[in-house]
């Protein structure tokens, strides 16, 4: 029978993760696990709190560390990811929400608050984090969300139920949006796949091995395929004066501006994220 590793200290835990993270990231991952799963304070962590975990806690810690040492993301190991002040269930088959996407939600809620925006569509919803956050932060809005993935929709629906968010979900391929659909929207928002295949070599191995490629990558020869399809759908489905919000690949920022202008959108804006990268676009029809 295989013997599980014994972990006696915080240092031993984070050093075990150095094949997948740099030192600072490894320490942050371990602190998140110890604080949120085992209830340790930072003082506990640095003062031998790991050694004082009881037998059942040690067994759970060993199981979690075995997954982390295989490169499984901490969010999958914990079963959730924080986003906009809430915990969203995540697991294999759904992209882990990124902190920068919170800015897209804030922007959408601001847009809803200053206009008559009521009907909102989130295309490529994944875990549902964008749609659910908007529904909860702007409770007068009516939010719908699409995704092509059955696994993603299952998780998104579970999140909406657990967070008491009134979101209507539908299985739909963003590349084949129903142009004959009579439904109209005030706001369409999307964070579609935008990482070019040639960028794979720059990405962390644990992301490549565990997160769904379907939600990440686009062909090098047509990296704007989702944006183009959604923009064309928006011309048909947005009400006059309606807004289109995207999270984008900063490497394609100028191409995105050109695409939206060529598709006859007005007031096209490019907005930087907290790190100064061109991460979002806004346009009206």
Segments the model singles out, each with a brief description of its role:
Residues 194-226:
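Mobile active-site "lid"/loop adjacent to the S-adenosyl-L-methionine
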Residues 34-110:
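Conserved AdoMet
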Residues 1-46, 53:
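Non-catalytic accessory regions of SAM-dependent methyltransferases
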Residues 100-202, 229:
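Conserved SAM/SAH cofactor-binding pocket of Class I
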Residues 78, 171-172, 272:
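Short loop/edge segments at beta-strand edges and connector loops
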């Amino acid at each position: 029978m295989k013997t599980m590793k014994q972990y006696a200290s915080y240092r031993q835990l984070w050093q075990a993760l150095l094949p997948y993270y740099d030192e600072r990231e490894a320490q942050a991952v371990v602190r998140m696990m110890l604080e949120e799963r085992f209830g340790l304070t930072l003082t506990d962590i640095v003062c031998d709190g790991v050694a004082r975990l009881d037998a059942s806690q040690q067994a759970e810690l060993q199981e979690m560390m075995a997954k982390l040492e295989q490169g499984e993301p901490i969010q999958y190991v914990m079963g959730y990811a924080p986003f906009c002040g809430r915990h969203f269930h995540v697991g294999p088959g759904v992209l882990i929400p990124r902190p920068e996407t919170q800015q897209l939600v804030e922007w959408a809620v601001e847009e809803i608050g200053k206009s008559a925006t009521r009907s909102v569509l989130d295309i490529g919803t994944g875990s549902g984090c964008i749609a659910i956050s908007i529904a909860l932060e702007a409770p007068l809005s009516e939010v719908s969300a699409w995704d092509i993935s059955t696994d993603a929709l299952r998780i998104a629906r579970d999140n909406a139920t657990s967070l008491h968010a009134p979101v209507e979900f539908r299985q739909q391929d963003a590349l084949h949006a129903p142009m004959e659909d009579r439904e109209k929207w005030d706001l369409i928002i999307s964070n579609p796949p935008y990482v070019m295949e040639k960028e794979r070599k720059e990405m962390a191995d644990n992301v490549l091995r565990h997160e769904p490629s379907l939600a990440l990558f686009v062909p090098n020869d047509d990296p704007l395929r989702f944006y183009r399809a959604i923009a064309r759908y928006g011309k048909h489905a947005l009400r006059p004066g309606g807004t289109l919000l995207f999270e984008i690949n900063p490497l394609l920022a100028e191409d995105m501006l050109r695409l939206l202008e060529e598709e006859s959108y007005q007031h096209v804006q490019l907005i930087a994220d907290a790190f100064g990268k061109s991460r979002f676009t806004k346009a009206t029809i």
